[in-house]
């Protein structure tokens, strides 16, 4: 079976791929398990040497890798360069720190020795999305290969070239054959094939970054077969703008968060909850800042906004905007599909949003900002927490003590930032709560998710 990828900026066909066959999947599962059994016995220094090499290769080949992202899913070159550097940083970070993170933790008891050891568990299936084709993979793969696990990647089919380039990086860095493997699977066949792979005894765990629907499917299947799973799902991140916020700081941060990657980011700001006394000024400044984002050719290094990754994504966002307007939202900016080739969508701003509306409660995966007003802080926090999502949140205020308290104790999310837009950092754990998933990636905590946290006692 074959499938073809499409350039979202030109609508031209790119590449045709042969789907990985059942026999090839069987071979990959066998070889992944064999590679794991050997790899786990190598020293941290041995593993780190190869991961450092990948970091070097990422930096060396950054323009070629960025070009692949630009033509496959529409990411502008400038944003692609940032993504590739972040991948190199996460490789360096785990190469430098994994031995420390995974060292035995001794606990004093009446025995001669009692300690916790962190051991690899085996091949891990990674089901990854298209929006950050390299970062989503490396933030998971880097810690897991340092832990000693092997990785089988099922990437989004519209970024198949990126997935092949990632696999080639592992080969060029002299990792063992099939320690990192890549499955090419068309969208319509993903549920059936994943349903066969997860129950397989050669798979020890599964991680997914994607929608809540996909996460529920994978988690239920993993749970049925008692496989460890980690899920990073969608978000409808709320940014709370208190009346004492510095709008010259807040607005650029808010717009950057919403517009990055054409709004196709799980941890993007999606709902702006603004004190009613400053709402008019915030809206005016937000619209002015949004107009700086002009859709264009992602291969042009000066373009700051590319197309959406697929036609169905463009149409879905547009339909959400139209329905929101029917529900009473006011269109302040954008909201029209441009008459041009490509799956472009303009910066769009909606106001007069009600808490029971679609745009408030659903994730909008595109460059659409929803602005909601409040008249007291308790109402703001209630609005921020009232959806099923809990990935990220931010608060803007000049009262740092208050901002810290609200971020720490009152906002329901896996990451809460004060006076800055939410972003992932290799040094900090990342993940969500509620319908935004469970488990953590990155940091010392992330590398332990797919470890056997083993208690060892010597009398």
Placement of each model-derived feature along the sequence:
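Structural signal for hydrophobic packing residues in well-ordered secondary-structure cores
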Residues: 36, 40, 55-62, 66, ...
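N-terminal Rossmann-like NAD(P)+-binding subdomain of aldehyde/semialdehyde dehydrogenases
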Residues: 1-112
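Residues at or immediately preceding the N-termini of alpha-helices
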Residues: 8, 22-25, 44, 62, ...
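ALDH superfamily catalytic-core signature
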Residues: 14, 174, 213-354, 382, ...
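Short, well-ordered beta-strand elements within core beta-sheets of diverse protein domains
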Residues: 15-20, 35-41, 126, 239-242, ...
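Rossmann-like NAD(P) dinucleotide-binding subdomain of oxidoreductase/dehydrogenase enzymes
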Residues: 107-249, 374
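Residue-level signal for inorganic ion chemistry
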Residues: 11, 47, 69, 91, ...
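Conserved C-terminal structural/oligomerization subdomain of aldehyde/semialdehyde dehydrogenase
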Residues: 10-16, 203, 240, 294, ...
